[in-house]
Amino acid sequence: GLLASLGKVLGGYLAEKLKP
């Protein structure tokens, strides 16, 4: 669903931001 897609995008964004 839309929320699942949004969560996936947000998770990827956070993962990139938290990468050293």
From Swiss-Prot:
Tissue localization of expression: Expressed by the skin dorsal glands.
- Give the main localization category: secreted
According to the lineage, what is the superkingdom?
Eukaryota
Where does this one sit in the cell?
Secreted
- The source organism is Ranoidea dahlii (Dahl's aquatic frog)
Its function, per the record, reads: Has no antimicrobial activity. Strongly inhibits the formation of NO by neuronal nitric oxide synthase at micromolar concentrations.
Task: Report the coiled-coil segments.
Answer: none
Protein name per Swiss-Prot or TrEMBL:
Dahlein-5.3
Q: Which UniProt keywords apply?
A: Amphibian defense peptide, Secreted
Disulfide bridge partners, by residue number: none
Q: Which GO terms describe its molecular function?
A: nitric-oxide synthase regulator activity
One cellular component (GO) term of this entry: extracellular region
What's a BP term from Gene Ontology annotated to this protein?
negative regulation of nitric-oxide synthase activity
